[in-house]
Amino acid sequence: MPQSTIPSLFLLIFSLLTSLNTALADASTALVAMEDSQNPLIRISTSKGEMYLELYPLEAPNNVENFIALAEGEKEFTNLKTGEPIQSRYYNGMRFHRVVPGFIIQAGSPAINPLGLQVSLLNDEINANALGLDQIPALNPDGSFADVLNIESKPDFHEEILTPLYSQRNITDVEAALSRQYQVLETLQELSVKSVYENQGYRYDDSLESRPIERGTVALANSGPDSNGSEFFISLTAAEWLWGKYTVIGKVVEGQEVMDSIGNTAIDPGQFSSLSTLIYSVRKAN
């Protein structure tokens, strides 16, 4: 070997060892930061760096199992072009396609899966009582709505509270609404936040533990009750108006600086952006 190549070869080996040690240190730090080292630890490698997620299999067993199976390539799909069965690590090559700075970063939509892979939907796994939603009145004494409901306008009130309540009470026309308006008013005064969500179709499981959505929480995106699939989001802040409506599956325990870096640039989910963060891989780290 020429003498001149020895320093460059040494630098290459040193660089590889350093990067390996850094990765090991990150995983080691993540394990220390975990609430329970027996829980699954997931590494998300992205173009902005790595994040480590601790998952909560006892709190959302079916949805955590599904997330891991998608990440590890354990699910069998059908190739839409050939009709042949295919197994693929679902999240590899996807992007954080929706970013709202100061709020959430979101990825995993079947609509933008590189292979067009579609997933089955699972039920929610949420305990509203554990979140205290059964103890929060929907109406405040001054007639305003509980902050957690995030009711900001009359259309919000009709869509989120009144229409579901009318449906639940089988009130189908204006005449019925007028004749039962005092009954409806009494019901409104007795509603808890949990009851509001139940009228919207959410169902809860008191046997599970549930956590609030806080900074770093990993939860499943949905289009309404019992519509959990592959899409997930990481919250950049506490978001009490999401409690009871989204199944929490874990938390970022290492790499929050990467999470924040991804969250610095707004990304519109309706159009592709080269500024969106690429996901290299999602896989178990323990």
Describe the predicted segments one by one.
Residues L20-N286:
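Cyclophilin-like peptidyl-prolyl cis-trans isomerases
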Residues M1-P7:
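Positively charged n-region of N-terminal signal peptides that target proteins for export
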Residues S8-S19:
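Bacterial N-terminal signal peptides
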